[in-house]
Regions:
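Electropositive, intrinsically flexible nucleic-acid-contacting patches
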Residues: 1-218
């Protein structure tokens, strides 16, 4: 059965949440751009932590060209389950296309942060934004008391990039330098973890007439 395009479009996840949770365990599993993309993806999760998006939907939210995301689906599988499914389309030459259902991992209490959707409005390159999320994940009381060399080694990044990104964050008012390191100043961007809601678990329900079907008298 072919489905009109307008119905297919309505199947994508279009409702944005006010926040996204990010587990600290993924800090070294994604590079900065992909970590920010993961944040954007998570903002559009449903109650079961599922997101039905195409690459073009993600590119639209991150402000990138689709070509920049050519390896995203492969890379993101380091932190979540991506299920592929066939979708019929109303096209004269093509009967179906393949879609992705991203399954956001559940909250790993207490080792996670809660980041406001307002972060998407911060005017910084996505590499810098992803780097900032990494800092939030490893900071203690919003402070990082490491030298540039040690921080670069910890994050698996180059020292020059760390230095450059820190300066960008300082100019954006998201970081201030202190003796022996720096302090993050996310203000309203970093939310209290108490507001975070764990994902719901989907439990298949038998049809209403299941009992009648099972115990139908002979």
């Amino acid at each position: 059965m072919k489905i009109p395009q307008r119905h297919l479009q309505s199947r994508t996840s279009n409702i944005r949440q006010d926040y996204a949770t990010i587990n600290k365990s993924i800090v070294d599993k994604l590079n900065p751009p992909n970590l920010y993309r993961f944040f954007c993806l998570s903002l559009y999760r449903n109650d079961y932590y599922k997101v039905r998006w195409r690459i073009k939907d993600l590119a639209k939210r991150t402000g990138e060209e689709e070509t920049a995301l050519k390896n995203f689906n492969k890379d993101i599988e380091a932190v979540l389950v991506r299920k592929r499914y066939r979708e019929d389309i109303n096209h004269p030459l093509i009967e179906f296309t393949m879609r992705s259902l991203y399954c956001i991992p559940p909250i790993d209490r207490p080792n996670f942060i809660t980041l406001s959707y307002l972060f998407i409005k911060v005017d910084l390159d996505i590499k810098v934004k992803g780097y900032y999320i990494k800092l939030l994940l490893i900071a203690e009381d919003n402070k990082i008391l490491l030298s540039l060399n040690k921080l670069a080694d910890k994050l698996g990044m180059g020292k020059k990039n760390v230095e450059s990104y820190n300066l960008d964050l300082y100019n954006a008012g998201l970081l201030k330098f202190i003796p022996n390191g720096f302090e993050l100043t996310p203000k309203e961007l970093l939310l209290d973890n108490d507001i975070a809601q764990q994902r719901k678990e989907w439990i298949p329900q038998p049809p209403k007439d299941f009992l009648k079907m099972t115990f139908k008298p002979k």
